[in-house]
């Protein structure tokens, strides 16, 4: 069985690569009233008074949306958002496994630049950051630019910044191996 067949088997068996789990054990009425109603009203009031309190009272502080329209999926091309969902789930688990960050895949059904920007703007309050993934060039650059102008959270364009980091690391290592010093 090759890697593709094994991967297909894994995906079919697990039916996805991540799940949402509760951090609160709701075992009785008191626990329910603290996690949900009526107790949840107080964190809501605090956030309404001071929006930065969302970083204290919610998972916003550690949650990143992995957003894609599926228009430039590595090795597959323009396969659309839904077909790209396994890739976005994979990226989400990389965030969790290697950085301890809760990545949430968000695939879009359309590929219009303004629609992408609007969709991300609308969901942004939930997240502490946005990771743009597999959006075709040159659209990806203008989507990133517009989102950085409009949002108050970090926007990371994975295909651009991730590649730049890898190239910079390779050049730094080559420089070191060649016995060169910075200066």
Q: Where is each model-derived feature located?
A:
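Short internal alpha-helix immediately C-terminal to a glycine-rich phosphate-binding loop
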Residues: 164-183
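N-terminal ligand-binding/catalytic initiation module
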Residues: 1-153
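Active-site nucleophile and cofactor-binding loops and adjacent substrate-binding regions
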Residues: 156-165
């Amino acid at each position: 069985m090759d890697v593709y067949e094994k991967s297909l088997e894994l995906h079919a068996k697990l039916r996805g690569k991540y799940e949402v789990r509760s951090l609160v054990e709701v075992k009785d009425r008191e626990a329910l009233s603290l996690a949900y109603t009526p107790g949840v009203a107080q964190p809501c009031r605090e956030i309404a008074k001071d929006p930065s309190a969302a970083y204290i009272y919610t998972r916003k502080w550690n949650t990143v949306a992995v957003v894609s329209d599926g228009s430039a999926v590595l090795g597959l091309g323009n396969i659309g958002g839904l077909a790209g969902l396994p890739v976005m789930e994979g990226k989400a688990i990389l965030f969790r496994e290697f950085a301890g960050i809760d990545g949430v895949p968000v695939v879009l059904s359309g590929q219009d630049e303004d629609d992408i920007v609007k969709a991300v703007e609308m969901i942004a309050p939930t997240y502490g950051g946005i990771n743009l993934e597999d959006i075709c060039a040159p659209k990806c650059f203008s989507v990133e630019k517009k989102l950085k102008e409009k949002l108050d959270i970090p926007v990371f364009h994975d295909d651009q910044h991730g590649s730049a980091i890898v190239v910079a690391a390779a050049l730094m290592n080559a420089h070191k191996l060649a016995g060169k010093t910075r200066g």
